[in-house]
């Protein structure tokens, strides 16, 4: 599936670059205002897949979201209140995240969308399933670019048999190292960014 939507490719690639670069900053999020008309908020995720996948608690609570993901979203959003209030409302807010950060970004977008902030878009890379069908219905009209790279195993968690779903269709990125069949290594955010650059170039 190619990338369809209203966001220019420069915005999408800048968001993915921020998702890659947020890790060395050792902070919960990274804000970029480099592209006119857009503010990008990249939420920190994790490149270490085994630790948190193993320890996931799969029970969906009454708010139809994974408890750990929702707690992380609330904590991150609380840190963003001051920064978000200072943003220009005429600029589109692009919320992005990789891995756990993708699930967190989805739930932050849900919180903002439900509170009437509709001038937003969502970009996720290698995100696990963030919640159930009620969440999917709530944000079905939200513009969302959901990238999956190669054989990344993280988007297959938590299990759909436990009630978890993805909220939007996938945009498949070819393996940046096409001789590799490693579902853990394919989760690397640097490879996501490189594959997205190639994806856009191939679809020009």
Place the predicted regions along the sequence by residue:
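Non-catalytic, mobile gating and regulatory segments of ester bond hydrolases
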Residues: 1-96, 100-204
